[in-house]
Amino acid sequence: MGGSLRVAVLGAPGVGKTAIIRQFLFGDYPERHRPTDGPRLYRPAVLLDGAVYDLSIRDGDVAGPGSSPGGPEEWPDAKDWSLQDTDAFVLVYDICSPDSFDYVKALRQRIAETRPAGAPEAPILVVGNKRDRQRLRFGPRRALAALVRRGWRCGYLECSAKYNWHVLRLFRELLRCALVRARPAHPALRLQGALHPARCSLM
């Protein structure tokens, strides 16, 4: 048994958080968007590099019901959405929505501010969803990726939950990096591009 990992999938409403999780776990895609009614917790077992890990994947909007993704001052206390005890984060935005990218930017800052002193740094993967709508994107991929990787020091990846493109890859990269962070004796690996040889599958 490999152990357990706690993952939070966060982002503005409507960016496709639940769709990404459902593609990863069940291989399906909801054609009609239905707002997530409160936080949901999924507990799959995953085989990664020959070891089995129990995952806790938290899905839910950070902002409370009826609120807008305007800024962190509108969000609940960090303890209410488990920022402090999460091992890894997926921050999802819509590549066609600059507001959702600003939301992720503020959310990343909120995560950094609420981590307890001395706690290990949790890896963050910023994910641009809806790559199938590439022609409508608000900014070039290379510029956004450079900002996230160099400026924010986070991983960056784009996916399409609708067509299940890069969905498995994003979880594989996030989980492997979380395991490396949990074992400081191992050589440091960069989040982006470190996991192409790794094997990851659901049990």
Curated annotation (Swiss-Prot):
InterPro entries, sorted: P-loop_NTPase (IPR027417), Ras-like_GTPase_Reg (IPR052661), Small_GTPase (IPR001806)
Transmembrane portions of the chain? none
UniProt propeptide residues: 201-203
How does the entry describe its membrane topology? Answer: Lipid-anchor
The organs and tissues expressing this protein are described as: Expression appears to be strictly limited to the central nervous system.
Q: Where is this motif: Effector region?
A: 33-42
List residues, modification Cysteine methyl ester: C200
- The EC number of this protein is 3.6.5.2
Q: PTM comment for this protein?
A: Isoprenylation is essential for nucleolar localization, and the proliferation-inhibiting activity of RASL10A.
Question: Annotated region Small GTPase-like: where?
Answer: 1-203
UniProtKB keywords: Cell membrane, GTP-binding, Hydrolase, Lipoprotein, Membrane, Methylation, Nucleotide-binding, Nucleus, Prenylation, Tumor suppressor
One of its Pfam families is: Ras
Q: Which GO terms describe its molecular function?
A: G protein activity; GTP binding; GTPase activity
Q: Which residues bind GTP?
A: 11-18, 59-62, 129-132
Q: What's its catalytic activity?
A: GTP + H2O = GDP + phosphate + H(+)
Functional description taken from the UniProt entry? Potent inhibitor of cellular proliferation.
What is stated as this protein's family in its record? Belongs to the small GTPase superfamily. Ras family.
**Name of protein:** Ras-like protein family member 10A
Query: Native species of this protein?
Result: Homo sapiens (Human)
